[in-house]
Amino acid sequence: MIAVIQRVTSASVTIDQKIKSKIGRGLLVLIGIQPDDDKNDIDWLSRKIVNLRIFNDEENVMNKSLKDVDGELLVVSQFTLHASTKKGNRPSYIAAAKPEIAILLYEEFVTVISSDLEKQALTGEFGADMKVELLNDGPVTIIIDSKNKK
């Protein structure tokens, strides 16, 4: 499971020209799911994201987590995070989980991270054509792969 985590002052998801979800200060998390991802990946990644100290404290040092700042969370599924560009110029998405597997893991991830955060994560719509808008704060963008826990 790959997560692209972006600290934002605001973010939103629009589907069919209607805003589905909108947050203020917090994190926008793009999630890519692989076929071999499981509950262990979900639990580890959720805890990591919720407790990542990437918000500034009173001394302007990144020392506070999403929980510490009572921030909001927007989670969007993005299978293209598993693109392979090794051959040719057209990306291959063979490493991404099939939709029937990915949707279950995505929904479980949203449930777990909402519980860990102790507030409901907002979402996009799995498989939909979405317009994602964000105002990156910093900018702070971090990529985490649950298969590479170094």
Give short role names for the model-derived ranges.
Residues 1-88, 97, 103-150:
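N-terminal, polar/charged subdomain of small-to-medium soluble alpha/beta proteins
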Residues 93:
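Glycine-rich, phosphate-binding/catalytic loops in enzymes
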